[in-house]
Amino acid sequence: MTTALDQLKQYTTVVADTGDFQQLAQYKPQDATTNPSLILKAVQKDAYKPILEKTVRDHRNESTDFIIDRLLIAFGTEILKLIPGRVSTEVDARLSFDTQRSIDKGRELIKLYEAAGVGRERILIKLASTWEGIRAAEVLQKEGIKCNMTLLFSLVQAAACAEAGAQLISPFVGRIYDWYKKQAGAEWNEARDGGANDPGVQSVRRIYTYYKTFGYKTEVMGASFRTTSQITELAGCDLLTISPDLLQKLQESNETVARKLSPETLQDKPAERVAIDEASFRFQLNDEAMATEKLAEGIRVFAADAVKLEKLIDALR
C-alpha cells in the first residue's frame, strides 16, 4: 500500500521543516527549511551541541553576530549533504524593517555558503514579508540570490512578493488557523471549520489561484502545519514544508491523497491584480487584523529566539 507521504510527493515537492537534520534521510525530502527557532531547538540537543561548540571555538574572538552566521552555514551545509535540492537560511528577524541591512545580510550569507563550496542555486535566503523585506528580496533576486519570503499571512503580501520577483513564498497555514480558532473560542467546530474550510488552507488556495491566474513564476510553499489534513487539503501546491512529526504521520498513513490544487482546475479566479504600491500595501495589511497581528508576533518570536541563541553562544566563550 502506498503511503500518504508517497502519494503527496506525486503532486507536490515535499520539504522538511527542521534543524534536526539527522531525521532527513528517512523522509527523503527534496528541500529543507530552517528558521531561528528551529536552529535554537537543534543546538540544545546533544546530537548538535558539538556543532555549536566547534563554531564558537573556531571564532571565539569574533562578534556574536559573526558566529551566528557561521552556525547557520554549518547547519545548512550539513543539511545539503542529505538532500538533493535547496536549503532555506533565515536573515535575523531584527532586520525585518531594514531593507539595506537585510540586503547586506543576504549577500553575506551567500558569500559564506560559496566559501564553503555551496553554489547559490542551492540556497534560499529567508526574509520576513514586510514591505522592507520584500524590497530587499527585489534587489537580491536581481543579483541571482533567490529568496524565500516567510511570515506571510495575506494575499497582499503574496502579491507584493510576486511583483518583486521573489523565488518562493511561505504562507503560514497553521498560524492563520490558530488565530481564527482562538477568535472563535467555544464557537469553533473542527468538523465544520477544519479540512477544506480551514482558514489557513483557504488562504493558501487563494494565493495559489492568484499566482496561477496571473502567470507569476514565484513558487508557493505552504508552511506551518498543525495537522495532516491541512497538508492533504493542499496536495498539488508547488511545495509544502512539513515538520518531522507530521512527515512521520504521513509516512505511517495509507489514507488516499487526492490532488486538490492544479493550474488546470482553478476555482474562484480573481478578476484583477491587487494594488501593491507602498501605501496600498500598508493599508491592506493593516486592514487585515489576523495578518497584522501574526506578522508582528512572528517577528517578535524569531527575534526573541535569536537573542536566546546569542546568550547560548556568549555562555560558551
UniProtKB/Swiss-Prot annotation:
State the source organism's domain of life. Bacteria
Pfam families tied to this protein: TAL_FSA
Query: Its catalytic activity?
Result: D-sedoheptulose 7-phosphate + D-glyceraldehyde 3-phosphate = D-erythrose 4-phosphate + beta-D-fructose 6-phosphate
User: Cytoplasm: is it a keyword of this entry?
Assistant: yes
Query: Residues in the active site?
Result: K126 (schiff-base intermediate with substrate)
One GO CC annotation: cytoplasm
In terms of Gene3D superfamilies, this protein maps to:
Aldolase class I
Q: Which InterPro entries match?
A: Aldolase_TIM, TAL/FSA, Transaldolase_1, Transaldolase_AS
| Stated family | Belongs to the transaldolase family. Type 1 subfamily.
Question: Its function?
Answer: Transaldolase is important for the balance of metabolites in the pentose-phosphate pathway.
How does the annotation summarize its subunit structure? Homodimer.
Name used for this protein in its record:
Transaldolase
What's the source species for this entry? Burkholderia orbicola (strain MC0-3)
